[in-house]
A protein has these predicted regions:
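Multi-pass alpha-helical transmembrane bundles in non-GPCR membrane proteins
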Residues: 1-205
């Protein structure tokens, strides 16, 4: 394993461990409150977060055929995490018509995105990124009800996380041309995850 891949695997191994601990924390908080919506939504969110970092760690640690399989799983897990991150905001913060509408649309897009990702054709990277961006910023259609339901500091945390993820895409797109760009992408992903997790912990839980 060359240095870049070592960094990629270790950085997301740290993310996986943190995600598992974070999952336990938010689910315990939800259980103590006895809120089934929080228990379900936090479980979905935390599980998708843990899956993404675990799969990414394995992808960057393996070689040969196994690496190719986990590369595909790595891409699929991105759709799951985006939809999983929306889940607490839609089922707990918004709920109602806006919450359920956004919940249905975002998970529908996740299914469509994963279906496209599973196709054997190559060269779908740009299309995948466009779907990531569409899913990530779809929340803006519910901006007004979200601002009414979420404290402003929570909205800033949500926005900041989105900016980290989106800003990192530049490094993701050119990671095959420039060495270590993929590692920088990983740092942006970690920053986005931390921002969104803290927002959920402090303003949704």
């Amino acid at each position: 394993m060359y240095y870049g891949e070592r960094f990629n695997s270790i950085s997301h191994l740290i993310g996986a461990v943190a995600a598992l601990a974070g999952l336990v924390v938010v689910v315990v908080i939800a259980a103590q409150q006895g809120d089934p919506w929080k228990i379900v939504s936090f479980s979905i969110y935390g599980t998708t977060l843990f899956l993404l970092y675990t799969i990414s760690t394995l992808y960057h640690s393996l070689r040969g055929r196994a690496k190719q399989i986990f590369r595909k799983l790595d891409h699929l897990s991105i759709y799951l995490l985006i939809a999983g991150t929306y889940t607490p905001f839609t089922l707990v913060t918004l709920r109602g018509v806006w919450g359920w509408w956004l919940f249905g649309v975002i998970w529908g897009l996740a299914v469509v995105g994963m279906a496209l990702e599973a196709l054997p054709q190559k060269g779908n990277r740009i299309l995948s990124v466009l779907v990531y961006i569409l899913m990530g910023w779809l929340v803006l259609v519910a901006l007004k009800p979200l601002l009414e339901a979420l404290p402003f500091a929570g909205f800033i945390g949500l926005l900041l996380g989105g900016l980290f993820y989106t800003g990192g895409i530049v490094f993701y797109l050119f990671d095959e041309q420039v060495r270590h760009f993929h590692g920088i992408w990983h740092l942006f992903v970690l920053a986005g995850s931390v921002s969104h997790y803290l927002t959920i912990l402090l303003y949704v839980a």
